[in-house]
A protein has these predicted regions:
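Short beta-strand/loop motif that positions the catalytic acidic residue
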Residues: 29, 35-41, 50
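Short, proline-enriched alpha-helix->beta-strand connector loops that line the catalytic pocket
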Residues: 27-33, 64-65
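C-terminal catalytic histidine-bearing segment of alpha/beta-hydrolase fold enzymes
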Residues: 60-121
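Conserved alpha/beta-hydrolase "acid-adjacent" motif
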Residues: 42-52, 61, 79
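Acidic beta-to-alpha connecting loop that harbors the catalytic carboxylate
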Residues: 39-42, 73-75
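Mobile cap/lid helix-loop segments that gate and shape the active-site cleft of serine hydrolases
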Residues: 1-24
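Conserved hydrophobic residues forming the short capping helix/wall of the S-adenosyl-L-methionine
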Residues: 57
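Glycine-rich, phosphate-binding/catalytic loops in enzymes
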Residues: 51-54, 87
């Protein structure tokens, strides 16, 4: 797992005790699910968690579509942004080191999310 930036609280957000109360029963969701994660996430282990969610849903024969998008360079703020990217560059090293890649991934994310929403809602 890569550690890129100044804002890195990943170690704080991993290795926690899992209790029944802390588990979200995703299999009870009644509709399609779009998961978005990034390997450069320095806030929480989003790629591992997305994979776990997909696995849990498969084990429960989840009847709705589940789409998981995983990006490589984009920061924890894997959201469509066309302005104020300077703030992301200030907070996350991956955004500074790979601005073109992050912009391309953000464009893909925007297109994929809009397509998913239009096809399901």
């Amino acid at each position: 797992m890569r550690t890129y930036g100044k804002l890195n609280i990943l170690s704080y957000n991993t290795g926690k005790d899992v209790t029944d109360e802390s588990i979200i029963p995703v299999e009870n969701i009644r509709g399609p699910i779009l998961l978005i994660s990034t390997e450069a996430d320095t806030v929480w282990p989003s790629t591992e968690q997305a994979a776990q969610i997909v696995s849990d849903l498969q084990e429960h024969d989840f009847p709705y579509e589940v789409k998981s998008l995983t990006y490589e360079k984009i920061s924890h703020f894997a959201i469509p942004m066309r302005s104020n990217t300077w703030l992301l560059k200030l907070m996350f090293r991956s955004e500074r080191q790979f601005p073109e890649e992050c912009a391309a991934e953000r464009t893909d994310l925007s297109e994929q999310a809009v397509d998913f929403i239009q096809n399901h809602w």
